[in-house]
Amino acid sequence: MKNLFLYCRAGYEKDCAAEIQQRAAELGIGGFVKANRDDAYVVFQGFSPDDGDRLAKELPLDSLIFARQMFACGDLLDDFSPEDRVTPIAESLTEVERAGELRVETPDTNEAKELSAFCRKFTVPLRQALKKRGVLLDKESSRRPIVHVCFVAPNKAFTGYSLSNNSSPHFMGIPRLKFPADAPSRSTLKLDEAFIHFIPREEHETRLRSGLNAVDLGACPGGWTYQLVRRGMMVHAIDNGPMNHDLMETGQVTHHRADGFKFEPARRNIYWLVCDMVEKPARVAELMEYWAIQGWFKEAIFNLKLPMKSRYKEVSQILANMHAILKENGIHEFHLACKHLYHDRDEVTVHLWLRPSSPWI
């Protein structure tokens, strides 16, 4: 397949397009992007017949900032009748063999969501047809490719596949998280999603374990602190504003009425540093760099608020600067990742893990 379909947040198509254009070029893959504002998806159209296949295999989804999910695809199917959508869709997927799962999806827009009920019903006959053709296995398998059918309109769809080891495990790339009734603010879901996205599930018991020490810069009223507390951590909450009473009653939170940009930890026993302050992204990045150089944490998750224009360019520059500054200051082993998460709005979430191979004392 020559194209690559990418889901993103509505309004961020231009940023997603700029990113995939650059990343494809880095792999020596030429093409152009089709994107319309508020469609919540973009399509990279390659010049060679297998460009989409190459990107689906060689470009790590986790390395993309603005794409929630991606799959190799053909051209838009828009010539089938409402009476028989199954046949043309099944015929478009003949290149896919022995896939382990079928996902009939829509972009994340209010208009497209109106097709959700249809997609659920349509999945049953389509699954049966794909099994008969050998496109799908009789039983689901998490190790085989995933078939994607994305309806962008009632009679228009993109079809293709993603590889199970380079694909979001979530439908449409969106994790379904429930807002805790006792959480101080909805921002709590941002950190919850960040932990799910950046930390492999099998490592939660070590890297997110009870008893770790954490610092939350700009903590008020405690949305992010809540996620640390519910995992059993001891938290230093830094903010001049008031903290949620119930959080303080847990005995796990020490509230420091101080400026998050001026606070310094008394001891070097902080594992997690988190920060969701409303501030210029470059200034927050500089603060994180300073903490890293001082050796004041092991892992950090922080948000960068985005400008109105040139968002991909701005974030890319900040990440490149951070990478260079850490190296210049003797930190040669680290993992730096960035994602525009579902619960983020005009911001991105960054994860920084210092010296991953060195044990935490």
From Swiss-Prot:
It is found in: Cytoplasm. Its EC number is 2.1.1.186. S-adenosyl-L-methionine binds at S187, C220, P221, G222, G223, D239, D259, D276. The keyword Transferase applies. Its main location: cytoplasm. InterPro entries: RlmM_FDX, RlmM_THUMP-like, RNA_MeTrfase_FtsJ_dom, rRNA_MeTrfase_M, SAM-dependent_MTases_sf. It catalyses: cytidine(2498) in 23S rRNA + S-adenosyl-L-methionine = 2'-O-methylcytidine(2498) in 23S rRNA + S-adenosyl-L-homocysteine + H(+). SUPFAM superfamilies: S-adenosyl-L-methionine-dependent methyltransferases. It is an enzyme of class 2 (transferase). Keywords: Cytoplasm, Methyltransferase, rRNA processing, S-adenosyl-L-methionine, Transferase. The keyword rRNA processing applies. The active site is at K305. GO terms for molecular function: S-adenosylmethionine-dependent methyltransferase activity. One of its GO terms (biological process) is rRNA processing. GO terms for cellular component: cytoplasm. Pfam families: FtsJ, RlmM_FDX, RLMM_N. Belongs to the class I-like SAM-binding methyltransferase superfamily. RNA methyltransferase RlmE family. RlmM subfamily. NCBIfam families: PRK11760.1 (NF008734). Catalyzes the 2'-O-methylation at nucleotide C2498 in 23S rRNA. Monomer. This is Ribosomal RNA large subunit methyltransferase M.
